From Swiss-Prot:
Lineage: Bacteria, Thermotogati, Deinococcota, Deinococci, Deinococcales
Record-given protein name: GTPase Era
Compartments, as annotated in UniProt: Cytoplasm; Cell membrane
Residues of the KH type-2 domain: 215-292
Membrane topology reported for the UniProt record: Peripheral membrane protein
Region of interest: G1: 22-29
Amino acid sequence: MSDPSMTSDGATTHSGFVAIVGKPNVGKSTLLNSFLGTKVAPTSPRPQTTRRGVRGISTTDTHQIVFVDTPGLHKPKDALGKYMNHEVHSALADVDVIIWVVDLRHPPTDEDELVARQVRELPKPLFLVGNKTDAAKYPDEAMKLYRAQLEGRSAETSEIMLSAQNNPLQVATLREQILDILPENPFFYPRGAASDQSRETWAAEIIREEAMKKLREELPYAVATRVNRWTEREDGLQRIEGEIVVEKNAHKGMVIGSGGKQLREIGQAARKQLEVFLDRKVFLGLEVIVIPGWREDEEALRELGYE
C-alpha cells in the first residue's frame, strides 16, 4: 500500500492549515487572495466583509497550505456577530500556523487586544504581519506596540511587514517561511483545488461584496446574499439566480433604488467580476427579499449558510 504522505516519486509531502486572523478591515482577505493569485474571499473597504471562514488552497509538488481567512474578531452585537467570532475561535483551535495581520497606520486598539489574547497562549508558530507600511507614518514604532502585546508568548513568533498593495516579493517571502514549517502530512485537498467553497457560495459572496461597496451607512451590515440556482446553457452562458436579503421593507427600497438603479448597478458590477473569473458570459438575475431581523434569528442564519 502506498504511503499517503509521499508523492508518486517517493518524495515526502507536507501540508497544514494556516489561520489568518486580525481585527476587522486590516487586509486579511486581500492577503489570502494574494497568496493564491486568485480571488476566493470578498474584499471591500468596509469592516466585517468576511463573515465565514474561507479556505484557500495553495499546492506545490510536495507542499500544500490550506489558508483559513477568518472574520474580524470584534465585540458582537447580534447572533451574526457571535457566529463570526465562533468562526475565528474554531479556526484557531484546528490550525498548525497562525498569521496575525495588523494595520500599522494605527496603534493597537481594544479589538487588537482581543486577538492578542486569543493567540498569546497558543503553542503554535505565529507570524505577526504588519500591513499597510507604505501608508503608515511610524510603522516601526507601531510594530513594537503590537509585538509588546505578544509578550510572554513561548511559541515561535516571526515578523514581516507588507505594503498596502501586498508586494508580490513580500508575500512570496512569507509564503516560503510558512512552507518551511509545515508538518509532514498527506495533502488534504486534490491538486488544483483553490478553495473548499461551493461555486454558489463564492458567487453569493461576490454579490454581497458589490452590495457592500454601493450601499451606505449601516445598511451593508444588514444585507446577506445567496444563490438559489446556477445553470449552464449549451452555448456556455452561465445563468445565475440570486437573492439579496434585508431585514426591513424600507431597506428593500434602498437596495433597489429609484427605478431599480441601485440594484442594476450592484448586479452589473457583480456580473463583471463573475465573468472575469469564470471566463464565461454570465446572466445574473437578482431579487431583493425581506427576512425580518435575520441577524438575530438563528434559524434564518442557518438558512443563509451561517452555521
